């Protein structure tokens, strides 16, 4: 690793941003923080600008003037850009080498797709880019010779366990000589693994966001509690590794030590192990194909008391079943599922519905919303139109329960 990479961290104020910037701060000889973006936590974004002095920063359109004023008062000469247009501009900037796509939800799709079309090196934490626009995204990566490296611990683990030829070209996974039989995504089971469905019905927001192993944002923590997070990761894995959903298994592994596995035709299982710390996959992707110090606590094998593997209960965790069904149906269904889930999770976080209502609302949305299937050449406007329709319909479903 000789050249300094210029990094744009989109979603810098979230948990992925925290972990990424901790690594970048410790490796100034390798990385230059060229651009940052944030949405809600602008005080934190200002502090990050003071720490890293990026050349550009993205904020909501309505906040551009005020944020520029605050930067000026702090003695910082940083260009401020606003809204989706600003994020796309940062992602496609000729000075940007690597885009860390860490914006949560559908809001991260346009800038991530733009980065792919600009041939950038993309470190992907935004699941929705593949859940909503999987084949479109993969086609853009290949057509424009971009590089796509997964930051999710599970997908990063699988990536590390695959032969180099498949890492370079996911269609190589079908070659018999590589012998890939199945992929195994591990799941923690979330905070309600040992509780009944009835207990889940009574769960508070505070209980749902208290993940047993990982430190994450509220939305992804709720998704972990319902196992929708694993459902979205299943869809993401299908696109990343060019496999149908029936070639990807999900297993609950409460200790979160094995981050995922690849099963080979000779009976071998290759697994990636590590402490449950997002800095490990982020450091891998930042430095790939080299390795750097992530700053994470090394795994102490002597402290491990045992590793468990449990089959998911698809009645209790219906969101996982819905994700498989949506993947079988097509991209239009995965867009609907993702949009419905975002609205339902928001309603739960606002104490409008129960945790277990999320799966019911998601299933209703899938059953009730009728749209045409998308082709592989669908554009972003078609994708966002289905997303918008699904959100509007789901808002009505939530209103019936409030």
UniProtKB/Swiss-Prot annotation:
- Specify which residues bind NADPH according to the UniProt entry for this protein: 13-16, 126, 128, 217
Q: Which residues bind 1-deoxy-D-xylulose 5-phosphate?
A: 127, 153-154, 188, 211, 224, 229-230, 233
Which regions span the lipid bilayer? Answer: none
Q: Does the keyword Oxidoreductase apply?
A: yes
The entry's Mn(2+)-binding residues are: 152, 154, 233
Query: Which BP terms in the Gene Ontology apply to this protein?
Result: isopentenyl diphosphate biosynthetic process, methylerythritol 4-phosphate pathway involved in terpenoid biosynthetic process
The reply on keyword NADP is yes
Question: Which domain of life does the protein's organism represent?
Answer: Bacteria
**Which Pfam families does this chain map to?**
DXP_redisom_C, DXP_reductoisom, DXPR_C
The reactions it catalyses are: 2-C-methyl-D-erythritol 4-phosphate + NADP(+) = 1-deoxy-D-xylulose 5-phosphate + NADPH + H(+)
Instruction: Please provide the record's keywords in A-Z order.
Output: Isoprene biosynthesis, Manganese, Metal-binding, NADP, Oxidoreductase
Return the similarity comment: Belongs to the DXR family.
Per its record, how is this protein called by name?
Answer: 1-deoxy-D-xylulose 5-phosphate reductoisomerase
Please tell me the species this chain comes from: Psychrobacter cryohalolentis (strain ATCC BAA-1226 / DSM 17306 / VKM B-2378 / K5)
């Amino acid at each position: 690793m000789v050249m300094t990479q210029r990094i744009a961290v989109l979603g810098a104020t979230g948990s992925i941003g925290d972990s990424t910037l901790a690594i970048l701060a410790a490796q100034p000889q390798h990385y230059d923080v060229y651009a940052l973006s944030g949405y809600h936590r602008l005080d934190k974004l200002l502090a990050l600008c003071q720490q890293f002095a990026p050349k550009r920063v993205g904020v909501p359109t309505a906040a551009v003037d005020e944020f520029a004023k605050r930067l000026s008062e702090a003695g910082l000469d940083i260009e401020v850009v606003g809204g989706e247009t600003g994020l796309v501009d940062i992602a496609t900037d000729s000075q940007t080498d690597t885009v860390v796509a860490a914006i949560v939800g559908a809001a991260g799709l346009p800038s991530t797709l733009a980065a792919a079309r600009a041939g950038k090196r993309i470190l992907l934490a935004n699941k929705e880019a593949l859940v909503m626009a999987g084949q479109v995204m993969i086609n853009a990566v290949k057509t424009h010779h971009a590089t796509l490296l997964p930051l999710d611990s599970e997908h990063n683990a699988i990536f590390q366990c695959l032969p180099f030829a498949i890492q370079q070209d996911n269609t190589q996974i079908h070659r018999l000589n590589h012998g890939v039989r199945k992929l195994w995504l591990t799941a923690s089971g979330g905070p309600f693994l040992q509780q009944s469905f009835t207990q889940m019905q009574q769960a508070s927001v505070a209980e749902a966001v208290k993940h047993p192993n990982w430190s994450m944002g509220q939305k992804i923590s709720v998704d972990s509690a319902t196992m929708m997070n694993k459902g979205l990761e299943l869809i993401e894995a299908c696109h990343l590794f060019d496999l149908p959903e029936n070639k990807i298994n999900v297993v609950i592994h409460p200790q979160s030590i094995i981050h995922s596995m690849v099963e080979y035709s000779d009976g071998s299982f290759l697994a990636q192990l590590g402490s449950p710390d997002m800095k490990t996959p982020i450091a891998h992707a930042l430095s790939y194909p080299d390795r750097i110090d992530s700053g994470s606590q090394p795994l102490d094998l002597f402290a491990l008391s045992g590793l468990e593997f449990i089959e998911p209960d698809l009645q209790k965790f219906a969101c996982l079943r819905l994700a498989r069904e949506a993947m079988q149906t097509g991209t239009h269904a995965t867009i609907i599922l993702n949009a419905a889930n975002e609205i339902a999770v928001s309603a739960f976080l606002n104490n409008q519905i129960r945790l277990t209502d999320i799966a019911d609302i998601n299933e209703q949305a899938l059953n009730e919303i009728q749209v045409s299937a998308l082709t592989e050449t669908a554009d972003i406007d078609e994708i966002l139109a289905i997303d918008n329709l699904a959100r509007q319909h789901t808002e009505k479903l939530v209103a019936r329960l409030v």
